[in-house]
UniProtKB/Swiss-Prot annotation:
A motif ('KMSKS' region) lies at residues 557-561. InterPro entries: aa-tRNA-synth_I_CS (IPR001412), aa-tRNA-synth_Ia (IPR002300), Anticodon_Ia_Val (IPR033705), M/V/L/I-tRNA-synth_anticd-bd (IPR013155), Rossmann-like_a/b/a_fold (IPR014729), tRNA-bd_arm (IPR010978), tRNAsynth_Ia_anticodon-bd (IPR009080), Val-tRNA_synth_C_sf (IPR037118). Monomer. One of its GO terms (cellular component) is cytosol. Its main location: cytoplasm. The gene is valS. This is Valine--tRNA ligase. GO terms for biological process: valyl-tRNA aminoacylation. Keywords: Aminoacyl-tRNA synthetase, ATP-binding, Coiled coil, Cytoplasm, Ligase, Nucleotide-binding, Protein biosynthesis. CDD domains: Anticodon_Ia_Val (cd07962), ValRS_core (cd00817). A motif ('HIGH' region) lies at residues 59-69. SUPFAM superfamilies: Anticodon-binding domain of a subclass of class I aminoacyl-tRNA synthetases (SSF47323), Nucleotidylyl transferase (SSF52374), tRNA-binding arm (SSF46589), ValRS/IleRS/LeuRS editing domain (SSF50677). It is found in: Cytoplasm.
C-alpha cells in the first residue's frame, strides 16, 4: 500500500465521498426512501433468525404528532434496530387508531360551523365525511411518522377500522357474549352531555375546582319528632340533583338519628315524601352524618339504592337539561337549574348555609365538560373473569414491567376493577354487532326488546328466523364500541387473528416488547392483556417498557392547555431527525423517568437538540478525516491489525471499544437506552475525536520509507481507525440511523443495495480489554490536559513551543510518560519533555497537579510576567465578586424558601465553581512570586 497525496485522484475521491458539511434533510430523505423502496423492514415470517416483534401504539387520526409521539418513536425504533442488528427476524408493525369520540367531536364542530347537525346529514353521509377526514389526517400522521425514521413495515400498516380488524372486533364481541362476559343492562354510567355519549371511568379526568357546599333542611313529615327534631340537615355540591332524592341515609350506629330511621321527610321544592334509612356506608363523623340519596345521579347512592330497593328517579336529560321529574325546573340547563334551585330553597327558608368548598369534579377527557352520572341502558364487559387470568399470568412473571414498580400499579388496577361500559352513542367507530328483533309496525326499543348478537347481518337474520320465524324485522344497534375495545385486540388482530393459520401470528405473536407511557397502563395495557388472555391464552407481550413524559425546561408537563407543547417537525427542520431522536433518548436518566427538553419559542431552538446536532457534525467530520487518511482503503480491505504492532494509543482505544461494545449491548438489552446513548456519546466525542484522532495524526502522515511502501505503523493506525469508526457507526445506528447509514456507506464503500440496518452487530474482542491500561492512559490524558491548561494560563501562542517537566515518584507513571513522549510532544507543542522525580526550580514556572503528578511549565523569557499577573488578578477579582453575589443570594432566607430546588442547586454549584476558580488564580499568582 502507498500513501495518497492530496493531488492523487484517489485522495480527491475519498475526500469527496462525503460532502464537506452534513445535510440532515437530504441524508434522511434519501435513506428513508431507499429503506422503504428496498423493503428493508418488510420481514418474511419464514426467514431465519429468532422472531422479535413490536406493535407501535397507534396514534389517533386526530391531527398532528406531538413530542410525546416523537419520544415514543425514538425509544421503539432504538430497540427494534438494535434487535435487527442482533440477527433477529424483526417485525415492527405500524398503524393508526380511529379515535371514535375525538374524531366525532371534531366533525361535529365542523358541522356546527355549517349550522347543521349529524342528524341533518344522516349516518351514511356523516360516515363518508369521517372516512374522508381520516384519509387526510391519517395520511398526514403517517408522513410524520416516516419523517421520524421509523423502521416499521409500512406494507403491513393497519387501521383499527380496516375490514380485517373490524372482523376481529366482531368475533371478539360474539365470543365474549357467548361466554356470558358481555351483557346489556341499565346501570349508572358517566355521561358526557357535550358528546352525547357514555364514557368509561378511564376517560374521566378528575379536576380540582373551587365550588360550594350547600347545606339544606329536609323537614320531618307531620311535624317535630318526640325529641323535638324538626328536620334533618344534608350537604351537597350538586343541589340540582336533590330533585331526584329518594331517601336520606344515616349510619345505623349513630345515636343522634337512630330513632328517626323509618320516618319520612318532605323533599324540599317538590313535596315528595322520602324515607330516612340506615346504611353502613354513611360516615357518621363527616358533616352532619346525614346523606341525601339520589340513586340515578351518584355511584355511591346507586349502590345504596340497590341495597334498599329504592326507586331511581332521573331528573336530567342526556343533553344536560332538566326533565319532567324536575318539576318547575324542567328545561333548564343543569347549571342554570343549580342557581334556580338554590334561589328557591333560600326563598322557602330551607337553605341553611353555603360554604366555599374545593373538591374534585369528573370531567370528560374528550368533551371537556363535567360528566353526569346517569342511568342508561348500555353494553358492559364483565371484567373480573378476564382480570383473573391476568393475575395468574402476573404471578408467573408475565408480562415483565420495566421499571418493575409499574407492576404493582397494574396489579392494583386488576384487583379493583369494575365492569367496563363499552357502548358509545356515536356513529364513527365499530358498530355493535347486535340486532334487535322489532315489530314491523313498531321499531321502538325498550329494555325488553329481544336482541341477537352475530358476526354479520346475514348471521343475525338466520338466528332471528330460527328463533322467531320468517316474519321478523331486525334492526342493528345504533351505538358503537368504545375505541379501547378494538385497541385491546391490537397486538394480535393486526397479525391476522382470528385466523389461527396466519403466518404472521404464528411467527411474531406474542410480541416481544410493548413501549408505552404510564398514563395508558389502564386504558390500553390492561385491556390488551385481558383480551389476549381471553382469545389467545397468552399475554400479548413479554416485556412492557414504561417511559415517562416529555417536560419543558421548567419541568412542566407538555400540553395544549399549558401552551408549552413543541412541534417535533420544527426541530427536525432545524436540526434533523437523528439529532432530535438522539437528544430525546440521551435525556432518559432511567426507565420510566420523565425527561426535560428545553425550547426557545421565539427562535424555535433547543440547546439540547442543537448539542445532538453538533455531535452529528462531529461524527461527520471524523469520518471525513478518516476517509482522507485511509489511502482509499476500507475497513475490509485494510483488515484486522496485528496485535504485536499496536501502539499504546491503539491498545487503549481498542480496549475502550471492546468495553463500550459490551456495555452498550448490556444497556440496550436492559432498556437503559439513555445510558447507552451517553456511553456512545462520550466514547465518540472524547475517546475517538478528542484523543485517538489527535494521537493518530502524526502516524497517518509519517512520509514514505526508501522502498516507497507506507510505513507499518501508518498501516496499523489506519486499520485501528477504520475498525473503531466502523464498529462505532453500527453501535450508533439504533440511535442515529440516517447519519450512521450514510457514514457507514462512505467508510465501507458498500453497494447502494446493501444496508447498515441489516448488518450484524460487531463482535467484541474481549482480548483487547485491559483495565490497567485504560487507567494508565487516563493519567496520560490528564497530564496532557494540565499542560494545555498551563499554556492557556500563560497566554502562549498555538505555535509557540516550551519545555515541559513532569515530576512523579511513581515508577510506572514515569515509565508511561517516557513511553508517550512523542504523543505528549505532538499534543502539547512541547519543545522537550523531561520526566523526573524532583523539580528543577532554577526557572520560574507555572505549576499544575494531577493526582500524584506535578507538571511544570517554565515561563522565564517566554511570557510577559506583568501582563500575566494582571490577567490573573483580574480573574481573581471577577471570581471573588461572583462569590460574594452568590453567597449573599444563598444566605437570603427568602431565596432558600421560595426559589425552586433546581435554581438553588444551580446557585450552589456556581458558587463552588467560582470558589475553585478563585483558589486557582491565587495559586497561579503564588507561582509567579
Amino acid at each position: 500500500m502507498t500513501e495518497l497525496s492530496a493531488a492523487d485522484p484517489a485522495f480527491v475521491q475519498a475526500a469527496d465521498a462525503l460532502a464537506k458539511t452534513y445535510d440532515p434533510a437530504g441524508t434522511e430523505s434519501r435513506w428513508q426512501c431507499a429503506w422503504e423502496e428496498s423493503g428493508v423492514f418488510h420481514p418474511d415470517p419464514q426467514a431465519a433468525g429468532e422472531p422479535f416483534s413490536v406493535v407501535i401504539p397507534p396514534p389517533n387520526v386526530t391531527g398532528s404528532l406531538h413530542m410525546g409521539h416523537a419520544f415514543n418513536t425514538a425509544l421503539i425504533d432504538t430497540i427494534v434496530r438494535f434487535q435487527r442488528l442482533q440477527g433477529k427476524n424483526v417485525l415492527c408493525l405500524p398503524g393508526t387508531d380511529h379515535a371514535s369520540i375525538a374524531v366525532q367531536t371534531i366533525l361535529e364542530k365542523q358541522l356546527k360551523a355549517e349550522a347543521i347537525s349529524r342528524y341533518d346529514l344522516g349516518r351514511e353521509a356523516f360516515l363518508e365525511r369521517a372516512w374522508a377526514w381520516k384519509e387526510e389526517s391519517g395520511g398526514r400522521i403517517v408522513d410524520q411518522l416516516r419523517r421520524l425514521g421509523y423502521s416499521v413495515d409500512w406494507q403491513r400498516q393497519r387501521f383499527t377500522l380496516d375490514e380485517g380488524l373490524s372482523a376481529a372486533v366482531r368475533e371478539a364481541f360474539v365470543r365474549l357474549h357467548e361466554q356470558g362476559l358481555i351483557y346489556r343492562g341499565e346501570y349508572l354510567v358517566n355521561w358526557c352531555p357535550a358528546s352525547g355519549s357514555a364514557v368509561s371511568d378511564l376517560e374521566v379526568e378528575m379536576k380540582e375546582v373551587d365550588g360550594h357546599l350547600w347545606h339544606l333542611r329536609y323537614p320531618l313529615t307531620g311535624g317535630p319528632a318526640a325529641d323535638g327534631t324538626t328536620h334533618l340537615e344534608v350537604a351537597t355540591t350538586r343541589p340540582e340533583t336533590m330533585l331526584g332524592d329518594v331517601a336520606v341515609a344515616v349510619n345505623p350506629a349513630d345515636e343522634r338519628y337512630r330513632h328517626l330511621v323509618g320516618q319520612t321527610l318532605i323533599l324540599p321544592l317538590l313535596g315528595r315524601e322520602i324515607p330516612v334509612i340506615a346504611d353502613d356506608h354513611v360516615d357518621q363523623d363527616f358533616g352532619t352524618g346525614c346523606v341525601k340519596v339520589t340513586p340515578a345521579h351518584d355511584p355511591n347512592d346507586f349502590a345504596i339504592g340497590r341495597r334498599h330497593d329504592l326507586p331511581q328517579i332521573t331528573v336530567m336529560n342526556k343533553n344536560g337539561s332538566m326533565n319532567g321529574h324536575a318539576g318547575r325546573f324542567e328545561g333548564l340547563d343543569r347549571f342554570e337549574a343549580r342557581k334556580a334551585v338554590v334561589a328557591a330553597l333560600q326563598e322557602e327558608g330551607l337553605l341553611v348555609k353555603v360554604e366555599p368548598h374545593r373538591h374534585s369534579v369528573p370531567y370528560s377527557d374528550r368533551g371537556k365538560v363535567p360528566v353526569e352520572p346517569l342511568l342508561s341502558t348500555q353494553w358492559f364487559v364483565r371484567m373480573e373473569p378476564l382480570a383473573a387470568r391476568c393475575h395468574e399470568c402476573l404471578d408467573h412473571g408475565a408480562p415483565r414491567f420495566v421499571p418493575n414498580r409499574w407492576q404493582k400499579v397494574y396489579r392494583d388496577w386488576l384487583t379493583e376493577i369494575r365492569d367496563w361500559c363499552i357502548s358509545r352513542q356515536l356513529w364513527w367507530g365499530h358498530r355493535i354487532p347486535a340486532w334487535f328483533v322489532v315489530s314491523e309496525t313498531d321499531d321502538q326499543l325498550t329494555d325488553a326488546t329481544p336482541y341477537l348478537v352475530a358476526r354479520s347481518e346475514e348471521e343475525a337474520w338466520q338466528q332471528a328466523r330460527d328463533q322467531f320465524g320468517e316474519a321478523v324485522v331486525i334492526q342493528q344497534d345504533e351505538d358503537v364500541l368504545d375505541t379501547w375495545f378494538s385497541s385491546g385486540l391490537w397486538p394480535f388482530s393486526t397479525m391476522g387473528w382470528p385466523d389461527q393459520e396466519s403466518a404472521d401470528l404464528e411467527c411474531w405473536y406474542p410480541t416481544s416488547t410493548l413501549v408505552t407511557g404510564f398514563d395508558i397502563i389502564f386504558f390500553w395495557v390492561a385491556r390488551m392483556t385481558m383480551m389476549a388472555g381471553a382469545f389467545t391464552g397468552r399475554m400479548p407481550f413479554a416485556d412492557v417498557y414504561i417511559h415517562g413524559l416529555v417536560r419543558d425546561e421548567q419541568n412542566r408537563k407538555m400540553s395544549k392547555s399549558a401552551g408549552n407543547g413543541i412541534d417535533p417537525l420544527l426541530l427536525i427542520e432545524r436540526y434533523g431527525t437523528d439529532a432530535l431522536r438522539f437528544a430525546l433518548v440521551r435525556e432518559v436518566a432511567g426507565a420510566g423517568q420523565d425527561i426535560r427538553l428545553d425550547y426557545d419559542r421565539k427562535s424555535d431552538t433547543s440547546a439540547t437538540v442543537e448539542a445532538a446536532r453538533n455531535f452529528a457534525n462531529k461524527l461527520w467530520n471524523a469520518t471525513r478525516f478518516a476517509l482522507m487518511n485511509l489511502g482509499g482503503e476500507t475497513p475490509a480491505s485494510l483488515g484486522e491489525p496485528d496485535p504485536a504492532s499496536l501502539q499504546l494509543a491503539d491498545r487503549w482505544i481498542l480496549s475502550r471499544l471492546a468495553r463500550m461494545n459490551r456495555d452498550v449491548v448490556e444497556r440496550y438489552d436492559s432498556y437503559r437506552l439513555g445510558e447507552a446513548a451517553k456511553c456512545l456519546y462520550e466514547f465518540a466525542w472524547n475517546d475517538i475525536c478528542d484523543w485517538y484522532l489527535e494521537l493518530s495524526k502524526r502516524r497517518l502522515h509519517p512520509g514514505e520509507d526508501a522502498s516507497g511502501e507506507v510505513l507499518a505503523d501508518q498501516c496499523t493506525a489506519r486499520q485501528v481507525l477504520a475498525k473503531v469508526l466502523a464498529d462505532l457507526l453500527v453501535m450508533l445506528h439504533p440511535l442515529m440511523p440516517h447519519l450512521s447509514e450514510e457514514l457507514w456507506h462512505g467508510l465501507t464503500g458498500a453497494p447502494k443495495d446493501t444496508f447498515l440496518a441489516l448488518q450484524s452487530w460487531p463482535a467484541s474482542n474481549k482480548s483487547f480489554l485491559d483495565d490497567a491500561l485504560e487507567l494508565s492512559f487516563t493519567e496520560l490524558i490528564e497530564a496532557i490536559r494540565v499542560v494545555r491548561n498551563l499554556r492557556a494560563v500563560a497566554g502562549l501562542k498555538p505555535a509557540q513551543t516550551v519545555p515541559v517537566q513532569f515530576i512523579t515518584g511513581r515508577p510506572e507513571l514515569a515509565a508511561l510518560l517516557e513511553q508517550a513522549t512523542a504523543d505528549i510532544t505532538a499534543l502539547t507543542r512541547a519543545e522537550s519533555v523531561v520526566v523526573a522525580t524532583s523539580a528543577d526550580l532554577t526557572q520560574r514556572c507555572l505549576a499544575g497537579v494531577s493526582g500524584e503528578l506535578q507538571v511544570l511549565l517554565p515561563i522565564d523569557g517566554l511570557v510577559d510576567l506583568d501582563a500575566l499577573r494582571g490577567r490573573l488578578e483580574k480573574d481573581l477579582a471577577k471570581a471573588e465578586k461572583e462569590i460574594a453575589g452568590l453567597a449573599g443570594r444563598l444566605a437570603n432566607p427568602n431565596f432558600a424558601i421560595k426559589a425552586p430546588p433546581n435554581v438553588v442547586e444551580e446557585c450552589q454549584s456556581n458558587l463552588a465553581e467560582a470558589e475553585a476558580q478563585a483558589e486557582l488564580a491565587r495559586q497561579r499568582l503564588s507561582d509567579l512570586g
